[in-house]
Amino acid sequence: MVQPFNQFSTLEDLGDLAPILRARPNILALLKLFRSLPPDDVDIIARYMHGYVALEDTVVFREGEIGDAMLFIVEGMVHVYRGDPVDGVTLGLLDRGKSFGEMALIENMPRSATCVVLHDCMFAAMTRANFEHLTADHPRLAITVLKDVARMLSNRLRHANETREGGMFDFLDLQ
């Protein structure tokens, strides 16, 4: 059973992503993490995800909160920053196709940044619990997703190391 992303009451839960995909079948194809997967695999993954919407200025999550989901931006834009909203350091501006919160699938640790909706957003979310269900039900597919997440995080880390002298870097904008 798909577990909703209920940690954050500020997001409007659209429910199971599968009916949304029937109405708009190419939604997940927009997401960079799923572009290399066959359509049948994308359909399977969608059954383990929920859709959400959030209006401008909605805080999706805050730095320091324990994460329990990875989010994919289907529409809209998100500002990712550390520290104070006014004087903090911008880590990235993420738009359609980008993802954030990936580490929440892997570990139960505090979020490293705050994410705020800049332009009204639609998200597809994978909770840690749902990823564990995907792993139990479709291990080959879960390994593929995990490898892609690891590759994405590796690219971000590599870019961060290359641009270290520039401050906190714009590494979240890579995918």
Name each model-derived stretch.
Residues 1-175:
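Cytosolic regulatory regions built on CNB/CRP/Popeye-like sensor folds
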